[in-house]
Amino acid sequence: MKTQVKALVVGGGAVGTSIAYHLGKRGWDTMLIERDELTSGSTWHAAGLLPLFNMSYATTHIHKYSVDFYKSLEAETGLNAGFAVVGNLRMAQTEERMDEYRLYASTAETCGVPYVFMSPDEIKAKWPLIRTEDLKGALYHHTDGYINPADVTMAMAKGARQFGVAIERKWQADGFHWTGSHWEVTCTKMVEKGGNLVPSEEQIVITAEHVVTASGNHAQRTAKMLGIKIPAIPVEHQFVVLEQDPALVAYRAEGNPEHPVIRDADAQSYVREERGGWILGVYEKEAPARFEHGVPDSFRADLFPLALERIEEQYMAMIHRVPSCEDSGLKDDFNGPICYTPDGNPLVGPAPGLRNMWLAEGFSFGITAAGGTGYYMAQMIVDGEAEIDMASLDPKRYGNWMTTEFAMRKNEECYDHVYILHHPDEERPAARPLRTAPAYDRQKARGAQFGWVNGWERPNYYGPLDAPEDFDEKSRSFRRGAWWQYAVEEARAIRQGVGLVDATAFTKHIVKGPGATAFLDWFTCNKLPRVGRINLTYALTAHGTTRTEYTIVRLSEQEYYLVSAGAWTAYDQDYLKKAIEDKEADFGRIELQDVTTQWGVFALAGPKARDVLRDVINDPDPATALSNKRFPWLSARQIELGMCPVNAIRVAYTGELGWELHHPMEMQNYLFDLLEKAGAKHGMKLV
């Protein structure tokens, strides 16, 4: 058994096997270790569906690659991957569901995914067993279908071996140590004992330049060993297999092709053929998260007891949609753990705070994503970045504020929300509010309807004061939601008067030290500002593509204040930190501080913004303190507003006069009240 490789993949499910295959194809000396047998985690009990439908640009590319890749595996390896290209029929019972599909169509066209819309009559003519009188239409992908998860994994494993990849079963990773140049991974031989898989006394250490973890349901164990947080926790997922349906058997005996995968999103379920019968898979309410502290050794290729009471509604919906199955008995059932993340997207990319450690965790649609994940992950590892933007899947989109309970509650919600209408302005309520700025209660009392960004509550708009709790949820639409009228009023206030925006969720970093200027000049692509001035700039990747947009304020010759998007605090900090470590020897000492939670931000914008600030600024000459001469565009000054010290930045992203008011977080309520009172006589509106 080899003990030194260029890349080590930990986990032998579909995802890990695909990554090993694609690294081997790129010519890398690669090994895969699996603590049990290949596919023994979630892969073996997956339904094997390959849906191309996804609202995410990156995920759609991943799924499309998988579907195309799986079709080529047999020719390459000689193994049939079990791909049934039957198509996927995604039905709509409402016009709003059709609107969702119309929105998706733009993503599909951008990514080159073929689709057609079908009318109820067209569906009935093509598949007469499907009841259609209550449908508005459907979205049909003719190029996808379903696959045998074990077969496709074994085909990828054979392909990987053909590229020289070593695959070792019954070896468990028990420790990771970074030496500064490579990883030393302590591995233990696993043995059978009393039906359980237990560690033996045999251990080895594998040396690898790069490590990829694809540990599936064991992600929490991986997180503990690496000393990081991975919000990938399994949720129970059920599907049942029915006995043969005589009407279906007769239909197929007439020479008709297999039905497509039938997705009834409004009934939270999918149906597909299975040997003359049907499989019903559901995404029901109240499915619990499991193994939040790790998978017990006694749980191997096991299942949970079926909870039929949870899926009764979906079972009846299947009978409604395919009436011929009503008399088919229950043949088999599955209730197994499927990993989820708080937003439903997997965690794919560099691990936070670690060098040459890569995560491929949290796949709720792992079979669909496996092929594409392996392809794009290999690009990231070998080339430095993928050919598509993978930021939406980056593991660092959650910071250290994330906890086990948060992940459990959000993952359960995500499972429950698989088939809800995914409006562009969708906000999900679980585990909220969690991160709130001091002015949260004041804003809520004034009608704020909040959005969620990186755990922070941030006002999206201000609705009626007497709005019910579900006002925002009921206001959503794929066309023009009820929030529109309030957004119009807020936009008009900034265009014609003045508005106050809470931008506290912005990411904020201090970069200082003898090497700060040289480093930032290298790190960003615009000219650095003079002291007291600001510039808008971008941090680039090693390949020269855009990674992060920054507002940079130069506080002194060697001290800078960096402001970036609130959603990417950990993402930006990790990139900054690693870049500083790489360049400190060249540029000199550089200090990085995350001050996001120390500073609140209000943005005051509109033609009357200067009038509001003039009434509260503490300055020897208030009349000129905020003039273009004393406070020009793209400049920054420390000012006092009443008793509050403020780092004011003359910038606005509204196209109007404006300032960002960066203030001590503990003084936010004081400043809010001060500005609200001063703004009242100028018609200031909360925005």
Give the predicted meaning of each segment.
Residues 2-15, 31:
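Beta1/beta-strand and adjacent pyrophosphate-binding region of the FAD-binding site
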Residues 18, 57, 176-304, 313-321, ...:
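Flavin-dependent oxidoreductases
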Residues 24-44:
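Glycine-rich FAD pyrophosphate-binding loop
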Residues 389, 394-687:
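Glycine/proline-enriched, intrinsically flexible loops and inter-domain linkers
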Residues 266, 275, 297-435:
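C-terminal catalytic lobe of FAD-dependent flavoproteins
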Residues 48-126, 266-271, 276-277, 298, ...:
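Dinucleotide-binding Rossmann-like beta1-alpha1 core, especially the glycine-rich loop
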Residues 71-72, 84, 93-170, 174-189, ...:
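Flavin (FAD/FMN) cofactor-binding and adjacent substrate-gating region
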Residues 11-13, 35, 362:
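Glycine-rich Rossmann-fold phosphate-binding loop(s) that bind the pyrophosphate
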